[in-house]
Amino acid sequence: MKQGVNPNDHKKVQRIDSRLEVEARLADARRHEAEDLTFREMFEAWLADGVSREDGNAELRRAFERDVLPAIGDKPVRLVDDSDLRAALRRVGRDRGAGRTAQRMLSELRQLYRWSLSRKPWRTLVADGSPAELVEARQVVNDDYEDGIRDRVLSDAEIRELHEIQVRLRSTYESLPAGHRYGGVRPMKRENELAIWIMLATLCRAGETMKAEWKDVDLQKAEWFLPAANTKTKVPMLVFLSPFALRQFEELHLLTGHTPWCFPARPSGRVREGAQPPDRHVHEKSASKQVGDRQVRFMSREGSLDHRKHDDSLVLANGERGVWTLHDLRRTGGTLMQAMGVPLDVIDRCQNHKLPGPKVRRHYLHHDYANEKRAAWNRLGQHLATILSAAATSKQVARKGRSRGARTTTATGQVLAGAE
């Protein structure tokens, strides 16, 4: 009071000053904490709120956890620069030779940073802009990488050879005594072998095929309905099954018809008697991986993967035409239709492509091309049946040759099973 200051007011000022100091310290701590947020934390935030894919982002997470997060996951976002991203992607595109994967991941990194630039607290940590934009696609691949759409088409000889390989591997494996099968070359699951011919005969994508349910397959009418949710274009499709394609589905039904799914997921662990059938389909890439695992000469792997095949049993034409994939079957079937004179607009509809042209045309023109598509699928099926019947003929010749001690080969030069 001697200084003319009310003690109560003085205490209030001190309390206010103390509170302001605490708030300032807390704000400073929060600022420092935000500044130290890691790339992994930004990635997790993006997965939760910035991107949504059909598989629940599982493939996206798997790719980043394998190739990006081990290198920069624990690094503060503000310290991650283009050289960090470039180095991580080069390990994929150059060291591993997976150029397409590296370029896809670069695109995903750009998406991640575009999302972060407009959201707190990330935008303050990337105030200088997206480092992913400073990485060029050509910088993460080898010099001989050919950037473009695959154009691999299987020849008639390769289609025939593929069938012969399947038959030979299965026959050889099943003829082995039970105790010796572990060391033998195990064929693909029969379901996936059938999937190959279904995809080739119908032009359907691998993911669409793996999701098929028996309720959508009418074996009596020879029809397969693909709901919009299962197609890439989100447009439903009715496939008219050729006799060739129908035979594949009929055999498949003997294997999996007791489940809702044409390609059911394998139950984990030991299956108990009376257990419920699988309640989901196999992973969309299950068959694709099985095909790739059997062409390892084209894969940049240092060794075999756990519980995965690691051989060259499905390499075609001695590998001279490179790796083949399941998506190549779709291209092959379309090309065969084209060679047989099927109009391109009918092929587009058989492949369920999103059709070009003005919306008004699609709005007013409603012919469903059912007869044209049925005829196209039937012609393709007849051609495939002819190819495989030639394979069967070559087997008969091989058996006669073996009886005379002759050495018999296929049209592609491959020695048939049992030939001397």
Predicted features by range, described:
Residues 23-96, 112-114, 139-143, 293:
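Basic/aromatic-enriched alpha-helical hairpins
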Residues 211-217, 338-339, 348-355, 364-365:
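A short, basic/aromatic helix-end/turn motif that makes direct DNA contacts
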Residues 3-26, 80, 114-146:
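Short, charged hinge/linker segments at domain and secondary-structure junctions
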Residues 92-110, 118, 125-206, 210, ...:
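Basic, Lys/Arg- and aromatic-enriched nucleic-acid-binding interface segment
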Residues 35, 39, 43, 56, ...:
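Hydrophobic (often cysteine-bearing) scaffold residues that line and stabilize catalytic clefts
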Residues 164, 168-192, 202, 239, ...:
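Short, basic (Lys/Arg/His-rich) helix/loop patches that form interaction surfaces
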Residues 31-32, 164-174, 221, 255-259, ...:
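C-terminal secondary-structure termini that scaffold catalytic or DNA-interacting sites
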